[in-house]
Amino acid sequence: MQADGKSTTTAVVLAAGLGTRMKSAMPKVLHPVAGRPMIGHVMATLAEAGIDRAVAVIGEGMEAVADAAAPHATAVQIDRLGTAHAVLAAREFIAANPADDLIVLYGDTPLITAETVDAMLAARRTAPQPGVVVLGFEPDDPGPYGRLILGADGSLEEIVEARDATAEQLAVGLCNSGVMVIDGARALEWLDRIGNGNAKGEYYLTDVVAIARADGAAAAVVIGDPDEVLGVNSRIELAEAEAIAQDRLRARAMEGGATLTDPLTVYFSWDTALGRDVTVGPNVVFGPGVRVGDNVEIRAFCHLEGATVAEGAVIGPFARLRPGADLGEGVRIGNFVEIKAADLAPGVKVNHLSYVGDSIVGAGANIGAGTITCNYDGHFKSKTIIGEGAFIGSNTA
């Protein structure tokens, strides 16, 4: 506990899985959801929950995962011998960062929210202060999941894997997500006592419940939203996670004052920022790094990434804004226009069939149809500068 009386938390994020079902050369946790690697979502959730002491457990040769987890620490799991073994791969970090609570999350479960993390920590810190808190959920099909068996008092008695469960236990609909909070003072001791006397010869984190109870500590369950605990192990599940993330982002946009005329056809990046009274037409895609001011209209079939759009601009239809596009107030970008690495001052019009790249365009300039800025001579890329109020005629290069 800190000097100010606030409880402390250390987080371990398990990210060493090979993800063989993804059939990809890329580590599973680096596959993006809403434009951000899955592990990046988990790390951001921890930050939102106020947890800054975190370590990602990765496999050998996963330097790219370490980069994605930065600035947080990483620990390497040499042999993949189960979830408890993975947590203990971070023993040095855990011991060096003693805390009231140890929370274990998964790098391939990107949709968990800070509110759920907060609820789990609150349950751990509320009398009778259980030694372990497990995040449970109630899926439509509980078939393959471990079951959470509760006692008459509502406490967690055991976690039973589906393959080991009796018919009565299989009838239980409350399932184990794998996410848990453990008493930080006893976590390493309990984890060290987990054995591997099972068919796979692995060390299961779920066994910590029985060990804690054997020491007289209670175990509790917090029930979460099934969407939040969706683990991504295949491309199909990646698509499911993307759909859930997009629904959240669409709702956030509309709740923030934007109008989406056909929400299901609009795709956002995790960091898209829209002002108030923005209107977005159908089939619009936002890549990472887009900032849109108030009262902007983005018409159908536009693609934006790495762009800034100031108040009152009109984009599209069928327009593309690439990284470095910076549009001033009231700028108009019409159909089949592409803007890249260009500053367009207020009132500029580029209405038809044009490419403006690596350019500075002065206020009020009008760029005629078919205009191309040709900046590259085969060796060097130069800057095109168009003055205020200029009129560039059609089919100009």
What is each model feature region?
Residues 22-26, 377:
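Conserved catalytic-core motifs of eukaryotic protein kinase domains, centered on the activation segment
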Residues 63, 70, 112-199, 206, ...:
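Conserved core of the sugar-phosphate nucleotidyltransferase
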Residues 26-32, 76, 194-197:
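Short glycine-enriched, charge-decorated loop/helix-capping segments at active-site entrances
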Residues 259-397:
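Structural signal for interior beta-strand "rungs" in well-ordered beta-sheet cores
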Residues 15, 58, 106, 136-137:
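Short beta-strand/turn micro-motifs composed of small residues
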Residues 10-22:
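A phosphate-binding catalytic loop at a beta-strand-loop-alpha-helix junction
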Residues 1-10, 32, 36-122:
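Conserved N-terminal catalytic core of the sugar/cofactor nucleotidyltransferase
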Residues 3, 7, 173-274:
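Conserved alpha/beta core of the MobA/IspD/sugar-nucleotide pyrophosphorylase nucleotidyltransferase superfamily
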